[in-house]
């Protein structure tokens, strides 16, 4: 090794990251080509929206994938990570509409469909790559040469093929039924695009007069009085004896005075409200189903804009919630309002804009799901596709067993326009894989295409195979489909995972992925979801700019367990930054002491420390590889951390220093250099998937075999180097050194002062301790070490500690000034007791507890507990010193 291999004193992530990412891309290390006979490993990226900006969820999700990809690349697999992004129909349309309104004061309707769609494409070209470039800042190693877009030519062709194929099989149909409607986004939504939130509202109890029976009423309870004008019946349970005589009678609708029947239906819950419910088939999904069963008329009283229709009579033209207020006022005036109760219930909100969803009867396109789900459920229950953690299998199968038809049409302009044409002359409806110019039935050119666009998730459901060239049978599909693993959050199992399994089994007749690796959400330090409204979001790019991408990546993964949410703590970011600095400094030290290193030099026999660290390396390689195979990426990262920090840096390097510094003993120095280089190179390889930049920088400076660490070979354990005896002996010595350090700290002894020690050692450890007592002297600050038999004479007036097979004694003579140390501790105790009294006073103050924020009270309690613990420790130390006087 020469001077050029030295690395700077301080690690600068920004310059290192830019340099190596450009190097990797230039050398096309991310790129994959089909290679028959070579083991494939493939992942398709969950495509981020083109409107997207990198957030912590993206950072976690993509780092998990990158670790798996980099690991398998080093394992020698033919590794493809297919990147791309999603057109995000509704989200993108809303974004461009906002820009249009702000910059030009126009709406999409002012531009017209064709011009507006052109504007969206222009916006996509300008901003679409933003999140891709942000992912590159994170170190993501996708095959960017294969970047796809859900509306590119190939994906659009796949969407057309899928739609027409399902249409021809009768699995896509156009129907009129009740759907979720967003009055703000002006489009239908599928069931899973509606977020149900527990909301504190009211139950209004309203009495409906019985026709022909004076002073006889049937009282109902409703959460939506604004829909009363759309009532076409009142329902009771046929088993409810309270209302048996009223079944079949007629009621008069309050305010509008229209007559409606009393019907019996077992769906009615006798315990809800009064046990009698109003039925509004056009504005409630359950009422709609009941209306079909009883052939009830459907009266639409709320329009698609959330405004009351003409059918609402005197309330026409009112916004739906203003109508609610006025109807309640009229009910009071007419003496029909019995009472109002507070009532908590789940209210559906649009996932995109968060407005309250309105159930409305409309004509939409649907996919029949029941004929498609069996194959998608079977492939999971028989183990062809496995969820990790396994508990999510139940979530998936449970939802699939109760699935409803999928509403796939959206009343928007940006997206895959539904490939159906209508003939204005003969009325024929035709689905086509290519754009039609004339009616296939009558030949008329008077045709028009359906105005609606497909749900964004329709194209996303085809992602694992549309990105690889389907419907053509490409070489890419042959090599890389089914993909190896899908990495995604539990929040889109139903939106995306289920639909990919359905489409994969239907069109490829094969699973889309072998494993589904589920992770949780990244929450703030208080466990809250990060959001704009709370102002608690943390920008990953800011973390990268300040601490480096490696720090963010390693912190996210080691703080994560499969399937569970994690909390973001700045303290953990700083802790990981310290780990990066530790690695850097250790590597810098090693390189500074590699002068004259020759890998072919004659070596001296391995020392105990050499044997131990090489054995521990093999153990770590096996542990990390096994954990990665089980998708326990956080545990694997922590195992690497412990090995590098707690074993290589804290112990081996410190023990190796005398040999590295001694240029006179060439063979011994060469051996220490060889072992340290071997261990560091292997450690960097293990760490590379997690921290790709710093490991590449260090690898390039160390003796190495590949032109880049990312295409080097993953370490394989060498069983000939596994040495349990060396590990046992070294553990005994390390435990002894820790005991010495703890005893010195306990009495506040000068850490730089050399002291004598006596060790009583068991027969089976005596030889190893005797031959390696230099380690104890070096790291324990011992100048004279006396070894005795374990059952031999125990020294008096000495501190003692017991570890496995060894008793360690430190004679007190000259170790500390007992009187001086006692005085110091007395002052420390008095100050802490004063602070404890102050904290206790606050916690016993009712006013403080009533007025102070919860986090302030929690901090005060934590302070009180911490002080109590410290006081107890000081008292014990003083009691111990008192015994020594």
Q: Across the structure, where does each feature detected by a protein language model lie?
A:
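N-terminal catalytic cores of NTP/NDP-binding nucleotidyl/phosphoryl-transfer enzymes
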Residues: 35-96, 150, 159, 220-222, ...
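Non-catalytic terminal extensions that flank enzyme cores
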Residues: 1-56, 73, 79, 338, ...
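Alpha-helical support elements that line or immediately flank enzyme active sites
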Residues: 58-60, 285-290, 499-507, 640
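Protease-associated
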Residues: 214-279, 283-289
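Residue patterns forming the tRNA-binding/recognition surfaces of aminoacyl-tRNA synthetases
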Residues: 5, 10, 19, 23-27, ...
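Short, solvent-exposed turn/loop segments enriched in Gly/Ser/Thr/Pro and often Arg
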Residues: 36-38, 46-47, 80-93, 147-155, ...
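Feature 926 captures the class I aminoacyl-tRNA synthetase adenylation module centered on the KMSKS loop
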Residues: 205, 398-458, 462, 506-549, ...
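Secondary-structure transition/capping motifs at alpha-helix termini
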Residues: 70-78, 99-109, 133, 137-142, ...
């Amino acid at each position: 090794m020469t001077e050029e291999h030295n690395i700077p004193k301080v690690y600068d992530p920004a310059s290192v990251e830019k340099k190596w990412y450009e190097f990797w891309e230039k050398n096309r290390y991310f790129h994959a080509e089909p290679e028959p006979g070579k083991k494939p490993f493939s992942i398709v990226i969950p495509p981020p929206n083109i409107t997207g900006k990198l957030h912590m969820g993206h950072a976690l999700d993509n780092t998990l994938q990158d670790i798996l990809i980099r690991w398998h690349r080093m394992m020698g697999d033919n590794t493809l990570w297919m990147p791309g992004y999603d057109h995000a129909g509704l989200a993108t349309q809303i974004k461009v509409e906002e820009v249009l309104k702000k910059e030009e004061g126009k709406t999409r309707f002012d531009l017209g469909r064709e011009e507006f769609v052109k504007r969206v494409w222009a916006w996509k070209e300008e901003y679409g790559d933003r999140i891709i470039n942000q992912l590159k800042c994170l170190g993501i190693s996708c095959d960017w040469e294969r970047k796809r877009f859900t509306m590119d030519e190939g994906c659009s062709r796949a969407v057309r093929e899928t739609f027409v194929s399902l249409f021809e099989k009768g699995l896509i149909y156009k129907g009129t039924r009740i759907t979720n409607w967003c009055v703000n986004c002006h489009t239908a939504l599928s069931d899973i695009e509606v977020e149900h939130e527990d909301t504190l509202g009211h139950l209004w109890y309203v009495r409906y007069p019985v026709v022909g029976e004076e002073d006889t009423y049937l009282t109902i309870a409703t959460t939506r009085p604004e829909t009363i004008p759309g009532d076409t019946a009142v329902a009771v349970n046929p088993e409810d004896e309270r209302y048996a005589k009223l079944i079949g009678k007629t009621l008069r609708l309050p305010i509008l005075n229209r007559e409606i029947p009393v019907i019996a239906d077992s769906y009615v819950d006798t315990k809800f409200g009064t046990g009698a419910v109003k039925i509004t088939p056009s504005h409630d999904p359950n009422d709609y189903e009941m209306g079909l069963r009883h052939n009830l008329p459907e009266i639409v009283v709320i329009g698609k804009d959330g405004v009351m229709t003409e059918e609402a009579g005197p309330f026409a033209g009112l916004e739906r919630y203003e109508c609610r207020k006025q109807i309640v006022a009229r009910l009071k005036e007419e003496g029909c309002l019995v009472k109002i109760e507070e009532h908590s219930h789940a209210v559906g909100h649009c996932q995109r804009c968060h407005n309250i969803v309105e159930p409305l009867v409309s004509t939409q396109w649907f996919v029949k799901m029941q004929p498609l789900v069996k194959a998608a459920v079977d492939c999971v229950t028989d183990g062809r596709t496995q969820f990790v953690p396994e508990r999510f299998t139940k979530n998936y199968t449970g939802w699939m067993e109760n699935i409803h038809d999928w509403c796939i049409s959206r009343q928007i302009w940006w997206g895959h326009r539904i490939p159906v044409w209508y003939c204005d002359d003969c009325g024929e409806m035709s689905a086509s894989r290519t754009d039609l110019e004339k009616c296939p039935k009558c030949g008329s050119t008077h045709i028009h295409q359906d105005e609606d666009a497909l749900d964004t998730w329709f194209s996303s459901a085809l992602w694992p195979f549309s990105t690889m060239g389907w419907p053509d049978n490409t070489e890419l599909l042959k090599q890389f489909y089914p993909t190896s693993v899908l990495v995604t959050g539990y929040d889109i199992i139903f939106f995306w995972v289920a639909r990919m399994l359905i489409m994969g089994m239907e069109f490829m007749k094969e699973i889309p992925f072998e494993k589904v690796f589920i992770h949780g959400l990244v929450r703030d330090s208080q466990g809250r979801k990060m959001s704009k409204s709370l102002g608690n979001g943390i920008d990953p790019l800011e973390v990268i700019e300040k601490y480096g991408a490696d720090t963010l990546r390693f912190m996210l993964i080691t703080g994560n367990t499969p399937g569970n949410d994690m909390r973001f703590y700045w303290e953990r970011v700083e802790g990981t930054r310290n780990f990066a600095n530790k690695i850097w400094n250790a590597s810098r030290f090693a390189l500074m002491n590699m002068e004259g290193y020759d890998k072919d030099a004659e070596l001296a026999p391995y020392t105990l420390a050499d044997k131990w660290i090489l054995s521990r390396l093999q153990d770590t390689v096996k542990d990390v590889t096994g954990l990665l195979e089980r998708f326990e990426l956080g545990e694997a990262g922590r195992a690497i951390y412990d090995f590098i920090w707690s074993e290589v840096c804290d112990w081996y390097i410190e023990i190796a220093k005398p040999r590295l510094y001694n240029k006179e003993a060439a063979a011994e120095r060469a051996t220490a250099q060889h072992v340290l280089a071997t261990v560091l190179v292997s450690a960097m390889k293990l760490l590379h998937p997690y921290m790709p930049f710093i490991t590449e920088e260090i690898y390039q400076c160390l003796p190495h075999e590949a032109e880049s660490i990312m295409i080097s070979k993953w370490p394989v354990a060498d069983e000939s180097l596994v040495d349990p005896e060396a590990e046992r002996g070294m553990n005994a010595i390390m435990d002894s050194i820790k005991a010495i350090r703890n005893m010195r700290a306990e009495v506040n002894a000068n850490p730089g002062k050399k002291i004598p020690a006596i060790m009583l050692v068991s027969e089976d450890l005596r030889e190893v301790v005797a031959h390696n007592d230099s380690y104890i002297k070096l790291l324990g600050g011992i100048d004279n070490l006396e070894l005795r038999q374990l059952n031999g004479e125990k020294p008096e007036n000495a501190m003692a500690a017991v570890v496995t097979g060894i008793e360690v004694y430190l004679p007190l003579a000259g170790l500390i000034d007992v009187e001086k140390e006692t005085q110091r501790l007395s002052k420390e105790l008095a100050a802490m007791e004063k602070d404890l009294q102050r904290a206790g006073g606050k916690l016993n103050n009712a006013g403080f507890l009533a007025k102070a924020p919860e986090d302030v009270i929690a901090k005060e309690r934590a302070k009180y507990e911490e002080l109590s613990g410290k006081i107890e420790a000081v008292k014990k130390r003083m009691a111990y010193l008192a015994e020594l006087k």
